[in-house]
Amino acid sequence: MAAKLIVGLGNPGPKYSWTRHNAGFMVLDRLASISGIQVTRKAFSGLSGDGNWAAERVYLLKPQTFMNLSGRSVAEALRFYKLSLSDLIVIHDDLDIPFGKVKLKEGGGHGGHNGLRSLAQELGSSAYARIRVGIGRPVHGDVVNFVLANFAKEEMDSLLEVLDTSVDALEMMIKEGMPKAMSIFNAR
C-alpha cells in the first residue's frame, strides 16, 4: 500500500480558527472527522495523525509554525516517513479562486501565498499536488487583513459544503488519480 502525506496549511491558535487563511486546516479537520483519524500527536513542529483512508496509508499534518514557516514542518515529515514530493498533497486557501470553488493543481508557483513560499524554500521544489480552496479576493482593502479575517456569515453558511467538496476531491485524487480528479473538480 502506498502512503500519502496530506498537509493542511493554516495558522495555529483559536484566534485564527475560522479565518480564511485556515481553510487548509479546516479541510484537514473535516477529513480527520470523516476518517476517524485523530490529528493530535505533537510531531514535526505540528499536529499529526495517521491511519488508512481511501485505500491508502495516510499521514495527516497541520504545521503549528505559523503559515510563513510551514515548509519546515512538511520537510521534517517527508524525511521521517521517507516520502517523496509525489506523495505530498497540500491543502490551502486561494485568493484567485472564488469562495465556494475547489480546484486541483500539480506544481506551480506560490502566487504570493506565504505557506507555499515556505514550502518551495524548504523543499527546493513546488512539484507536489495541491487542493486549492477558493476564498475570493476582497472588494476593498488589504489582502492580509482579508485572509486573516473570519469567513463572513453568508460564507459560514456554506462552508461545510466546501469542506466536503474538498475531501471528495482529495479522495478522488488518491483513488482515481490526479488527471481524473482535475477533469471533474476543475470543471465545476
UniProtKB/Swiss-Prot annotation:
The active site is at H21 (proton acceptor). It catalyses: an N-acyl-L-alpha-aminoacyl-tRNA + H2O = an N-acyl-L-amino acid + a tRNA + H(+). Keywords: Cytoplasm, Hydrolase, RNA-binding, tRNA-binding. Its EC number is 3.1.1.29. Coiled coil: none annotated. GO terms for molecular function: peptidyl-tRNA hydrolase activity; tRNA binding. TRNA binds at Y16, F66, N68, N114. CDD domains: PTH. Signal peptide: none annotated. It is found in: Cytoplasm. The record marks N11 as: Discriminates between blocked and unblocked aminoacyl-tRNA. It comes from the Bacteria. It is an enzyme of class 3 (hydrolase). GO terms for biological process: protein quality control for misfolded or incompletely synthesized proteins; rescue of stalled ribosome. The record marks D93 as: Stabilizes the basic form of H active site to accept a proton. One of its GO terms (cellular component) is cytoplasm. InterPro entries: Pept_tRNA_hydro, Pept_tRNA_hydro_CS, Pept_tRNA_hydro_sf. The keyword Cytoplasm applies. The keyword Hydrolase applies. NCBIfam families: pth. Monomer. HAMAP family: Pept_tRNA_hydro_bact. Belongs to the PTH family. Hydrolyzes ribosome-free peptidyl-tRNAs (with 1 or more amino acids incorporated), which drop off the ribosome during protein synthesis, or as a result of ribosome stalling. PANTHER family: PEPTIDYL-TRNA HYDROLASE. This is Peptidyl-tRNA hydrolase.
